[in-house]
A protein has these predicted regions:
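Glycine- and acidic-residue-biased ligand/ion/polar-headgroup-sensing regions
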Residues: 56-68, 73, 82
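Conserved short histidine dyad/triad with adjacent acidic residue
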Residues: 23-28, 39-54
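A short, N-terminal "cap"/entry segment at the start of jelly-roll beta-barrel domains
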Residues: 1-35, 130-148
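Ligand-binding loop in jelly-roll beta-barrel domains
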Residues: 32, 89-115
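A hydrophobic, small-residue-rich beta->alpha segment in the mid-to-C-terminal subdomain
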Residues: 104, 116-130
């Protein structure tokens, strides 16, 4: 366990382009001794990951801005700003921004470590406000396969 305080300023953290979105790693497993990590995802219109499963992480999604369509075990949930969606391990899920506005979601991952997959599969970017290109089908499949 770490005993260091970490402060991440606005638009701070490591920014990773993945699945056509920007994942900003605010707190990583190195900061929390592996207990949890926190990632802010900027989900651009029509963005979001393919359906996937995590086998070890609990994921908590808190919608900060905009609206996302979550599909959780085949059930669709429209999550607007202020909505929290908790997804335990072994549950197929995805989310998509079906609007024409940027959506932002804060994601708590426990235990930590999934953020390393984002770094492995995605591309680091310096400006978290610019929409990245869509991810290739090969990279998207690798993301879904490795995330499990």
């Amino acid at each position: 366990m770490t005993d260091k305080i970490k402060i991440t300023e606005h638009n701070g953290g490591k920014h990773i382009a993945i699945a056509g979105d920007i994942n900003s790693i605010l707190v990583s497993k190195n900061d929390t001794g592996g207990t949890y990590s926190i990632v802010e995802i900027k989900v651009f219109p029509n963005g979001g990951p393919v359906p996937h499963i995590q086998t070890r992480e609990h994921e908590g999604f808190y919608v900060l801005e905009g609206e996302l369509l979550f599909t959780v075990d085949g059930t669709e949930i429209i999550a607007k700003s202020g909505t929290f969606v908790n997804i335990p391990p072994h549950v197929t899920h995805s989310f998509t921004n079906k609007t024409n506005q940027l959506a932002k979601v804060l994601v708590v991952l426990a235990p930590a470590g999934l953020e390393n997959l984002f770094i492995e599969v995605g591309d680091e970017v310096s400006d978290p406000t610019i929409q990245p290109p869509s991810m290739s089908a090969d990279k998207m499949k690798k993301f879904a396969d490795v995330a499990a």
